[in-house]
C-alpha cells in the first residue's frame, strides 16, 4: 500500500510539474495580454513551488521503506525547490520590475533548467517503479 501511495505521489509531482511548466504559462499568454499573464504567473508560482515541495517530500517519505535511492532523489527535489522559491523567484521578479531583461533571461533560464531537471528526476523515479530494486 505504501508503494502505491508513493507511486501516486510521484505521478502527481511529475504530472503537476509538466502541466504547470509546459501548459499554464503558454495558456495564460495565449488568452491574456502579456502584462496580465505575467501578473497571474507571479501569483501562481509560489503555490506551484509549495506543491512541488509537498508532493516530492510526501513521495520521498512514502517510497523510503522500499527504495532509498528514489527517496533520496525525491527529497533532493523538495530541498532544491526551497531556494528556487525563496531566492531565485524573488530575484526573477526583481529583474522584471527593474526592466533588466538580461538578468531576467539568465535567472529565468536557471529556473527553467531546475524545473527540467526536476521533471527528469521525477520521471526517472517513476520508471524505477517498473523495475523495483532487487527485481529481475
Question: Model-derived features: where do they sit?
Answer:
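Polytopic transmembrane helical bundles with strong interfacial aromatic enrichment
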Residues: 1-136
Amino acid at each position: 500500500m505504501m508503494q502505491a501511495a508513493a507511486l501516486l505521489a510521484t505521478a502527481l509531482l511529475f504530472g503537476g510539474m509538466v502541466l504547470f511548466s509546459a501548459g499554464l504559462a503558454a495558456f495564460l499568454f495565449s488568452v491574456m495580454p502579456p502584462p496580465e499573464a505575467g501578473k497571474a504567473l507571479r501569483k501562481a508560482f509560489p503555490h506551484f513551488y509549495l506543491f512541488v515541495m509537498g508532493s516530492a517530500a510526501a513521495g520521498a517519505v512514502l517510497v523510503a521503506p522500499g527504495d532509498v535511492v528514489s527517496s533520496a532523489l525525491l527529497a533532493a527535489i523538495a530541498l532544491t525547490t526551497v531556494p528556487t522559491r525563496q531566492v531565485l523567484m524573488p530575484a526573477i521578479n526583481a529583474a522584471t520590475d527593474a526592466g533588466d531583461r538580461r538578468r531576467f533571461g539568465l535567472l529565468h533560464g536557471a529556473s527553467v533548467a531546475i524545473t527540467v531537471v526536476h521533471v527528469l528526476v521525477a520521471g526517472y523515479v517513476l520508471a524505477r517503479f517498473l523495475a523495483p530494486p532487487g527485481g529481475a
